[in-house]
C-alpha cells in the first residue's frame, strides 16, 4: 500500500492532473483517499473540498458506482460529527447531475433544430412531408436516446444513490425528504413512469426498514410529530405525482401508505392535507369505476372543505359533485350489505362476502369510515348537510325525479334535458353513464308497482327519449333486465313470443338476506304496497288494529301500560346509573393502566434515549479529546519552536545591544554558544558597571552645581522685592478693566432678554393651551401604558408562579428518580462487593493450596539434591584414594602385558557402559577444570606427563591386577568423577598410551564426556 498522503497534497495533485486533461488519473488519485487506513482520522475540513472535487469528476466521467462508494465512505465518517457536510456534498452531486441533463436536453433541441434546408422557399417538399407522416418524431426520439437518455439514467442513479445514503438516519432526515421530493419532480417532469414505480418501491422499502434499524444510535422515530409530518408531506407529493402520471395503481398504494402513516399520528393532520387526500382518493375511485366509494370520498371531502376558506362558487361546485356522485351510485350494486344482492342463497352470499370483504374493508378503512357506505346512507347524509340547497338547480331537480317523485311514464323524458345539460360539463360528463343505469333501474321499479306486464315496445317508447350516444336498443334493455334479475334486484320474466316483460310477485316469497328488504325499501319510491308485502305484514297490521281497538274500549289499559312503562323506565334509569358508575370506574381503571403503561414506555424510551445519548456523548468526547490532544501537541510544538526562535533572537539582540554600548566584545562563535541566561548575567554586570560610573559623574556634577546655585540666589535676592511691586500694579489694572467689561456685558444681555420676553409674552396663552393638550394626551397614554404594564406584570407573575410550581414538581420528580437510582446503585454495589469478596476468598484458598504444593515439591527437590550431593562426595573420596594409590605405584611398576591391558580395557568399557539411572534427575553440570586440576585430566595430558618422566610402557614390569571397579550405583556422575574412577580402577591412561586409539575414537574421547547408555523408563511393576 502506498504511503498516506495529506489531503491537501492529493487535492493539489488532482487539480494539476485536471489542468492537463487527465481527468481519469485525477479521479483515481482522489479515490485512493477512501482506501487508506487513515481516512477515518482525517479532519472533515480537509475532506470536504476533496469530496466536492471527487463528485465533480464522477459526474463528468459518469462514474456513478464509484461516486456511490465514495459517498458511502464519507457518510460513515461524517454522520456522527458533521451531518451538514454530507448533506452539502450530496446536494452538490444531485445539482451537477441535473445540470448535465438540462445541458443534454438543450443540445438535443439544438441538434433537432439544425436541419439543413436546401431551398428556403420550398423547405417542405412532397418527399419530406411523406417521410414526416411516416416517421413522425423519430429524429427527435433518436437524438434524445443518444444525448439525453444516458444523462437521465445517470441522474436517476444519482437520486437512488442519495436516497440509499441518507436513509434511516435521524440527522439526515431533512435532506432525505428533500431528495425524495426532487426525485418525484424528476419523474413527473420527464414522464418517467417506470422510474416512478421503482422510486415508490424504494421509499416504501425504506419506511419498512425503520423498525429494523430502531436500535441504532440515530434511528428514525416515527412517533415524533415533525418526522411523521415530513413523511406525510413526501407521500402526498408521491400521490400527486402518481395522479398526474395517471399511474392509478401506484396512486392507490400511495394512499395506503398515507393511511398507515395517519394511523401512527398522535395528532390529527391538517384539514387541507386530508382534503387533498380525499380528493385524490375520489379520482382514483372514479378511474376504477367504483362509484360507491367515489361518492363516499366526495362526501368526506365536503365535510373537510366546509372548514376551509373557500368562495361561494367553490362550495356550490363541491356540493354539486357530492350530490351527483351519490345519485350516480348504481342501485343494483349498492342495495344489500356487501354487494347488495337480493334473492340469493346463503352460500352465494357467503361466497360473495368472502371475496369482497377484504377489499371493501380496506376501502372503508382508507376513507376512515366505521362501516361500508351505502347509496341510501350517502344521500341521507347529503340531505342532513343541506347539500340540496347549495347544489346546482338541475341537480336538485334530478334528485327530486329519481328519489322523490313517482312518474314511470315520463321519467325518461324529464331526465333527458338534465343529462344533456350535465354532459356539457367536462368534469360531470363522466357521471352520465352511471346515471343512465340508475334511471333504468328506477323505471323498472316504478313500472313493476303499476303493471303486471308491459310490452317491450312500450318500454322502448319510454326510453326513446334518450338521444345518442346514450340511446338503447331492445337487446341492451333485455341485457339490463337479465343483469338486474341475476343480481336479485328485480323479479322479471321476458316473454319473447309476446314481446312482453312480466313482473312476477310471489305472495309468499321472502328475502333470503334480512337486510335486503329494508335496503330495497329505503332506495325505492313506492306508490302502493305489493301483495307479498301485504301478506308479510298481515299479522303486524292485525296486531296494530286490535291494540287500537282495546285502547278505545278500555282506557285503563293505556293508563296501566303507561304506569308499567314508567316503572320500567325508573328501573332502567337506576340500572343505567349503576352501569354508568361501573363503566366510569372501569374506564378510570383502564385509563390508569394505560397511563401506567405509557409512563413505563416513556421511561423506557427516555432511558434508551439517554443511553444512546450517553454513548454518542462518550464517543464525541473521546473524539474531541483526541482532537484536542493532537491540537495541544501541535500547539505545544509550535510554541516550543517559537520560544526557541524568540530566545535566539533575543540573545542576538541582547548581544548586539551590549556590543553597541561598547562594554562587551564577543565574536560570532561566542555569540552562538552563549545562551540567554549568560547574556542576561553579562548585561546585568554591564548595567551595574554603568550605574557606578553614572553615580560618580553625578556626584561631581552635584558638587559643582551647589556652588553655582548659591551664587545665583545671592545675586537675585535684591531683585525679587522690585518685581513683586511691579506685579501688584499690573494685577490691579487688569482687575479694574475686567470689572468694567463684565458690567457692560451684563447690561446688554439684560436688555436683550427683556426684548425677547416682550415678544414671547404674546404667544404665552397659545403655549399654555398646547401644553395642557399635550399633557392631557400624554397623561392618557401614560395611564393606558401603566394599565397594560400592570396587566402584563400580573400575567408575568402568574406565569412565574406556574413556572415555579412546575420547577418544584419537576425537581421533586427528579429527586425521587435520583433516590431510586441511588438505592438501585447501592444494591448493585453491595452485590458486586459480595461477589468480589467471594472471588477474593476463593483466590486466597487457591493460592494457599498452590503454595503448599510448591513447598512440598521444593522440599522433595532439596532432599534429592542432598542425597545426590552425599553420593557425589563419597564417589569423589573414593576417586581421590584411587588416584593416590595409582601415583604411588607409578614409580616402580612397568607396563602390563597386552592381555592384561585388553582385560582392563574390557573392564573399563563395562564400567562405562553401565545402565543409565532409572530416574532422570537434575544434577550439577560437570566441571572439567576441576578434573584437570586433580591430575585426572584427558589422556593426552597424562601421556605427556608419563613421557616426561622417562617411563616406557612396553618395558615396564607388569603390575598386580587392580581391583575391579565398583558396580554402578545407578546415580548420575559428572565426567570429572567418572574419569577419576576409571583411572584408579584400571589405569586407563596407561592402557591408552599402550594401545593408541584411532583418530576418530581419539577425537571422540577428547571432548571430556562419557557415553551413557539410554534406557527407557519402566514402572517398578513392569521391570524385567
Swiss-Prot record:
Stretches assigned to coiled coil: 575-717, 777-889
Bias-annotated ranges (Basic and acidic residues): 797-866, 873-886
Gene3D superfamilies (alphabetical): 1.25.40.860, UVR domain (4.10.860.10)
Record-level Gene Ontology MF annotations: mRNA binding; translation initiation factor activity
Keywords: Coiled coil, Cytoplasm, Initiation factor, Protein biosynthesis, RNA-binding
Classification via InterPro entries: EIF3A, eIF3a_PCI_TPR-like, PCI_dom
Record's compositionally biased regions (Low complexity): 890-906, 946-971
Main location per the UniProt record: cytoplasm
Entry's family note: Belongs to the eIF-3 subunit A family.
Listed name of the protein: Eukaryotic translation initiation factor 3 subunit A
